[in-house]
């Protein structure tokens, strides 16, 4: 349904994995989760493609960055990990993906004026205020804080933020990754790199017995 995965950094694969998990959840819920909700996803993903110009502007801010901390919580945690992986693969940026809890437990000490943070949050749900508080806490250290998703207060707490989807929190990951993918593509291009063919990567990795 998604077509061949041509790019070495597998973006379609990630989204279709989310889809497979969602379909499984619908099947196991015995009617508790409706298919109608999933039908909201395609339009939300398409809407996120319009974020490309803003993603290019944010990429310009990050082009000279040497390291980056990416963090999310709840349903957005997987998005943060996937985004940090794509930044490493395609932009050769040593991005560290951490959950909110792991970050504030100790590694938060490395975030300063020379180490930006990229925070990812759904547009609603109980995690948004906590991510907003984290953005403010990091900004108080002088760290450049950038965001993806969240609400207006979250965006205001960040130096710059890319909008996220208007989806319930449990569906947000489908479209929340798209601004991150656009940012990754723009940052790789700004560095003169080919985001579809990173060095040292093959389509299939054999790890041996």
Question: Can you say where each PLM-predicted feature lies in the sequence?
Answer:
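A SIS-like phosphosugar-recognition module
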Residues: 1-209
